[in-house]
């Protein structure tokens, strides 16, 4: 039986005024996979996620989620279809409590009636969020804020989450804990696209990987068959 394609990006170009950020990018993500998008700063990784989530508009190409076109849709419609973004830099609402930040994530018609049930699941995954639920989010540590950003994305009951640089600025022990939770999330049936600069960790977590360089896909494949030399050449453009 063929794998179900959750996300299909075909021939994507994205411009910011006169600057072209993505050039004919195509990727496929099967349902249930963890797919890693790797590249240095400026490679176009965040642009790819932002365009998939509806925050940016492509100038060419298509994006399909479970067979339906989602390119050019506003972000709230993309979320309602089952795609959630964990943005770079966490972007929690600083003067709202942990609970209020999570509450905001459950605004879709599907998730609203089950808000308390979903909250319980998030609290099981990240017990510290339950402990600090009445605390202002700007008083949390960086790792706790990242847990909150992931929890908020999960409140809409997504089928796919797009994680943008979730290890940025965090201590290795905290990163290890967050990646452990990501494995649990994936084992619960949620497909994950993971954007990272950390080559080793992201390849270890993924079933499949794409490497971007200057807005183009320069290498793709299963991490287990990618050689260190291939990855270095693709990442650094050697």
Where are these regions (language model features)?
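The feature captures the beta-strand-to-loop junction immediately N-terminal to the Walker
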Residues: 38-40
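ABC ATPase C-loop
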Residues: 153-154
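Conserved ABC transporter NBD signature motif
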Residues: 61-70, 81, 114-119, 219-221
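Conserved ABC ATPase signature
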Residues: 136-140, 144
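Conserved catalytic motifs of ABC-family nucleotide-binding domains
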Residues: 157
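ABC-type ATPase nucleotide-binding domains, specifically the catalytic core motifs of the NBD
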Residues: 17, 73, 98-117, 125-130, ...
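Helix-to-loop junction immediately C-terminal to a conserved catalytic motif
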Residues: 53
